[in-house]
């Protein structure tokens, strides 16, 4: 089935992961065969949220884009529902790459990875492990820096292990809201989510075709604690990176994103997005095109084999 909104066309598609899950996706085909980007939305988000504005922009510049619902989310397969597993999501980028490489509209030698917020660090890790990715674009990457003490972490681990034991005894997974009424996150990490995240979550409910649900399994947080984008950076090698950093990010402070950028030793570019915050990065305001244009320029520079 094909849809068109404001002259933006996409096709509903699906592909399989190595462990036989079906992931539902949108394919934004360019006007002719050529380069492509594998894209994924943010934490517990679906393909209808945030990323479509970027995909449509890339499409208009001749880049085919694939956005897919992460495993366990939206219309994609996987259980427990809304269990966020960064390690498996890295794997899914590789399977999305395999799918994209087989499409007639795509040049398999000109595919990059793209991610925003949570998925930016997932895409970065995937690019470290998949030599087929010719570049990686990370937009407002969440760096998994929890900003808590060892004692605070132990308290979280005690609660997570207790819930894991409850599941082992036959109880259903426990679900927790992404943010409470005060905008606090359930594991009390030192991150300023507050009003911005709470407002975004309310908006996301109206955007998702499959009904965005603002809860995740409590065990998702165990999986977050076991992941770090820094662990894979040594394998990125000469794959070019572009990082887009919002001027006013409080969800993942600018200095944390720049620290991650500085840890990359290979070819790289950074763009500081004027007027942008973490959760309005892809809103089509007056700052949108100035933020998207450098990404397109970087992408085609890489595809032409020019030095970064």
Curated annotation (Swiss-Prot):
GO terms for biological process: terpenoid biosynthetic process. Disruption phenotype: Abolishes the production of all the sesquiterpene ester compounds. InterPro entries: AB_hydrolase_1, AB_hydrolase_fold, Polyketide_trans_af380. Residues 35-159 form the AB hydrolase-1 domain. Keywords: Transferase. It is an enzyme of class 2 (transferase). Acyltransferase; part of the gene cluster that mediates the biosynthesis of various drimane-type sesquiterpene esters, compounds that exhibit diverse biological activities and are widely present in eukaryotes. The pathway begins with the synthesis of the backbone drimenol by the terpene cyclase drtB using farnesyl pyrophosphate (FPP) as substrate. This is Acyltransferase drtE. It comes from Aspergillus calidoustus. The lineage of its organism: Eukaryota, Fungi, Dikarya, Ascomycota, Pezizomycotina. The gene is drtE.
